[in-house]
């Protein structure tokens, strides 16, 4: 069951000041990641209790550097990502296919239960764990033609990050999509109940 909107990612440069004061948000650590379009900066803003989280993203250099103000992605929070994945896959949701090598690498990086690893792989769910044992699960849809994509997330054990370790995997999976890919929602099955 989806319990709410977890994160909304927006362009970084034009919106940071807008969100800081009026909404009582504070900056978290800024992360920089290399991408084919240039260096991507991601600045997380949160309320003190973490009930509102906004990730501002921007390409700092390269041909894709832009001051666009459109929403780039929306993440929805769930209490059970595997149940939500099953409901979505039975409906119109098309998950972003995760490369097979990701799960082999994941098994090497974390001491993981084989059943959990198999469940992640079967549902194209990404995983991260912090130094305190907090866990983060991510499920992405295929992007819309505008570039907007949706994500389902589940946090366990106080994980407070955004899964930055999985960002290169998501970008790699996107790069492997065929030019004429399916849409994230099949119009014949466009009604989803979660």
Locations of the language-model features?
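Single conserved hydrophobic/aromatic residue that forms the stacking wall/gate
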Residues: 1-8
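Vicinal oxygen chelate
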Residues: 5, 29-54, 86, 91-194
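Amphipathic alpha-helical segments
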Residues: 11-27
């Amino acid at each position: 069951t989806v319990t709410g909107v977890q994160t909304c990612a927006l362009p970084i440069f034009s919106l940071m000041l807008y969100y800081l004061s009026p909404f009582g948000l504070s900056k978290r650590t800024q992360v920089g990641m290399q991408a084919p379009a240039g260096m991507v900066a991601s600045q997380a803003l949160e309320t003190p209790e973490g009930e509102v989280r906004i990730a501002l993203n921007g390409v700092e250099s390269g041909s894709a550097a832009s001051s666009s103000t459109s929403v780039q992605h929306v993440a929805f929070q769930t209490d059970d990502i595997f149940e939500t994945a099953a409901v979505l896959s039975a409906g119109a949701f098309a998950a972003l296919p995760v490369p097979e090598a990701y799960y082999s690498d994941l098994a090497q990086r974390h001491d993981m239960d084989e059943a959990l690893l198999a469940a992640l792989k079967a549902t194209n769910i990404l995983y991260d764990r912090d130094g305190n044992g907090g866990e983060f699960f991510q499920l992405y849809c295929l992007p819309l033609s505008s570039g907007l994509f949706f994500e389902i997330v589940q946090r366990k054990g106080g994980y407070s990050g955004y899964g930055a370790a999985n960002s290169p995997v998501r970008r790699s999976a996107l790069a492997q999509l065929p030019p004429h890919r399916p849409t994230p929602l099949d119009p014949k099955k466009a009604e989803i109940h979660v």
